[in-house]
Amino acid sequence: MKKILYAAAMTALMASPALAENIGVSMAKFDDNFLTVLRNGMQDYAKEKDGVNLQVEDAQNDVSKQLSQIQNFIAQGVDAIIVNPVDTDATPAMTKLAVAAGIPLVYVNRMPSDNPLPAKVSFVGSNEVDSGTLEMQEVCKIMGGKGNILVLMGELSNQAARQRTQDIHDVIAKPECAGIKIVEEQTGNWDRTQGTDLMTNWISSGVQFDAVVSNNDEMAIGAIQALKAAGVDLNKVIVAGVDATQDALAAMKAGELDVTVFQNAAAQGSGAVDTALKLAKGESVESMVWVPFELVTPANMEQYLSKN
C-alpha cells in the first residue's frame, strides 16, 4: 500500500508545473521613455516563460530607495535580482548585499562600477564606447570636420553619460574632426525639459553653434523644441541624440533630428531576464552580455520605427 501511495505521489509531483522563478527588479525610475521600453521588454519576455514572476519596483531616481528595494528582495528570498542602477557608483554596495545573500544579480543598461564583477553577477547592456562614438563620427561627417558644437550631458553620476561625453571628446581629437570645437557642455540629466531650458539659455546668451550633440534623445528633443520656439532654422543646425526612441524617430521623420543611435531597450530587457534565469539555475553566463548599438540616420530610419 505504501509503495502505491509513494508511486502516486511521485506521479503527481512529476505532473505538476515546475517551481516558479521569482525575480525582483529595481528600475532607476518608471518616468522615462527609454526605461519604459526596457521594463516592457523584461515583462513581455517573462510572460513567455512558464512560472516566471517579476516583481518590478520604481526607485524614483533615489539611491537609498533602490538599496532598500534590494534588501527587501533579499528578505523575500527571490531567486534572482535585476537592477537598473540609479547611480552606477553605488553598485558595489548592491553587489555586496546580493553576494552575501547568495542571490544572483544582473545589472541592466547602466554598467556597474564594480570591476571585475564577482561570480553570479552579470551586466546586460550596450557598450557605451560605441554609442557616443557612432553619434559623433556621423556629426563630424555631416559638419565636414569643422564648426562649433554644444554638448548636452546626462546625469553625471551615470557611467553612460560620462562615457558618451568622453566618446565625443575622443572623436573630435582625431585629425579628421580636429576643426570641431565644443563651445558649451552642460548636464541636462537625461531630461527633455532640462534640455529645453539649457538650449533656451544658450540661444539667449548668443552662443554661436552649428550642432547640438546630446547624450540621449530626450534632451535632444528638448533642444529641438527650444530651437523651434526661438525661430531657428533647423535646416542650418545639426541635432544628434542616442536611443532611437519613438519620439526621436518621429522628430527625424519630420526633418528635425539628424542623428541618433539605436539602443535596443527591449533586447536588453529580455536579455536581463534570460541571464537572471540562467544564473538562478546555476548555469554559466558571461559577466558582460553585450547588445550592439546601431547608427540611425534619415537614410535607414524606416527599419527602426517599430523597434523601440
Locations of regions flagged by a protein language model:
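A residue-level marker of the well-folded mature domains of exported/periplasmic proteins
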Residues: 3-5, 13, 19-308
